[in-house]
Every structure is written in C-alpha cells, then in structure tokens.
C-alpha cells in the first residue's frame, strides 16, 4: 500500500509551594541535557497529544495490519467484520468516521484499513482543502477501492463539504461552470471509493456530513497494559534494551495515549544513553520522567497549574472555561481539547452546569488534604 500525503515531579508529600521552588532548577537541567536529534525541544510539549513535527512521518513504528494493532479491541472486531464482508462482496468499504481525543491512532487505523483492503491511501487535512478545486483534485484521481483520509474533517469549509455530499452518496462530482444566470452544473462520475474522516470534535460536524458515513466509531483512551505492549513493541523496533518494568513506568505516565507513550519512550531512551548504559529499567524511566516533571499520574506542570489555579484562586470551582483561560493564560480551546479530556478521564476534574470543579482526588494528588475515593487509575 502506498501512502500519499498532501516543573515538578508532583510527589504527593509535597505541597504546591515546594514544587514551585524546584521549577527553575528543573528547567536548567533539561536545557543542559542534550537529547539526540531534539536539542532545544520544549519539555512542556511532551504530554500534548497532537503530533509534533516529524512524528507523523515515522512510518516504521506504525502497525501495518489489524493483527499488529494493539488495543481498541471492540473497534478492531467491528472493522475486521467490515473488511471480511467487503472482501467477500468484492466491494470497497463503506465510508468511516473516527472520533476521539488526539493521539489515539485514528490516522493509523485508516492506513491499516487501506492496507488490509490492498488499496491506495490518500491522506490530507481539512484545512488544506480550502476551495472546491482542492477536494476535486483528490476525487477525480481516485480509483475503485481507493481510500481518501481527511483529518480534522470538522474544519472543512462549507462549500467543500457540500461538494462531498454527492461524491459520498452517489459517487459523482458536481461542478458549477460559469457564473450568474448562465451558470450550469456538470456532473462527473467517480470511481467507488472509501472516505475516512477523523475528528476530535464530532459535535462540530454537520448532520448531513455525519449521516453519510456508514460507520461512526469512537477511539477510547488505552489501558496501561495496552500501552506497555506498545512501548515494548517500539523498543524492539528501535533496538533499545527495555525491561517490562521500565515499559510499565513509561506507560502509566502516558495519559492513555500511544503517541505520548512513544514520545516519552524516546526521551527516556535518550536519557538512558546519556546518563546510563542505554538500558531502560524502571529506575531509569522514573528518573528521566521526573526530570521532565511528568508525574506518576501522567500530569505535567501545565496540568498542575490548571488545577492549582482552580484551588487557590477559586476554592476548587466551579469556574467557567473562559475565566480559567484568562487566569492561566492558556487558550480556551487548548484547555478543552488538550488538557481537560485526561483530567476528566482520571477523575481529577468535573464539568458541571456552572463550570469546572476540582475533585477531592486531585486535591490529594496536589498535596492538599481531602477525603475522597482513590482516583480511577491509582
């Protein structure tokens, strides 16, 4: 198959004041530690689930088949049935829409589906499809069974989206020729193809577009044992000696996200090479991740800043999103799409009709006294 593409460790015994005092020393040490290939990388971006420059091109780490794909068991079962049925009928797959937080493998699943079907895989993003001619350029060259993958599909311009409706439903491309009263529509037949869309904001899709997908599937956060398998697989592919305990230490701090797990693994690998003998043990992994202020629950200094501001300035909440963004200096969309999903997942933050509220579990993790059940992944 061809692919064509357009702060502090957060120890529970420490309070917020002590963690703040360690910040400058941490930043100095991170700057001085030269990591192979990524000198000057921003350590605060380690836990952001969005792809960093160059990461999306690392095809060697991507699974090629459903059998190689780790995790998402229910999704794989649904897709294996769809693939078998399409093969039996000798038909292309129905259109598919994948949604969920970033970094969970939506692009990878799309590429795996194309490989399983023996199809050509065309990949683009909605922001790159600014005008109808952009999407038309893809549609007219698709052959029967080819897969067109559109990432961030919720960001499609309206005129481009409307061009997709007849293409998805009737496999035709409606082109308007001329302007004003002399304008006319010419329809071009298209080969039967499969459109796969990916989005982190399924609620932002219009109903007409969403309803044209035959499969709408959600990708969930990964369990720690699944991330351990992913880390060990990456270690084998990169030929890095790694203990299962070292892989587990990385996995439990990876926020349920494979992209973050692989990113943290590479930083731990660099640390082991510079500060040790190249072998990743539990002790080496913990020391490396503590250097980057990724604590045992997978929180970094920005996560802790968000929670601490809610506690110290607003008594734990409730606080509206815009207010929280103004006080912390973070973009509201970044808070909502990057940081909140994981904090909600582990039970450290709650959304209420009146705003965001810090939970007792988060208070205890930050070093404040609180009586509550243990967090979900403790």
Swiss-Prot record:
Locate the region Large ATPase domain (RuvB-L). Answer: 13-222
- What Pfam families does UniProt report for this protein, alphabetically? AAA_lid_4, RuvB_C, RuvB_N
For this UniProt record, give its keywords in alphabetical order, as a comma-separated list. Answer: ATP-binding, Cytoplasm, DNA damage, DNA recombination, DNA repair, DNA-binding, Hydrolase, Nucleotide-binding
Q: What class of enzyme is it?
A: hydrolase
Residues that coordinate or bind Mg(2+): 107
Role of this protein: The RuvA-RuvB-RuvC complex processes Holliday junction (HJ) DNA during genetic recombination and DNA repair, while the RuvA-RuvB complex plays an important role in the rescue of blocked DNA replication forks via replication fork reversal (RFR). RuvA specifically binds to HJ cruciform DNA, conferring on it an open structure. The RuvB hexamer acts as an ATP-dependent pump, pulling dsDNA into and through the RuvAB complex. RuvB forms 2 homohexamers on either side of HJ DNA bound by 1 or 2 RuvA tetramers; 4 subunits per hexamer contact DNA at a time.
> What's the name of the protein?
Holliday junction branch migration complex subunit RuvB
What species is given as this protein's source?
Synechococcus sp. (strain JA-2-3B'a(2-13)) (Cyanobacteria bacterium Yellowstone B-Prime)
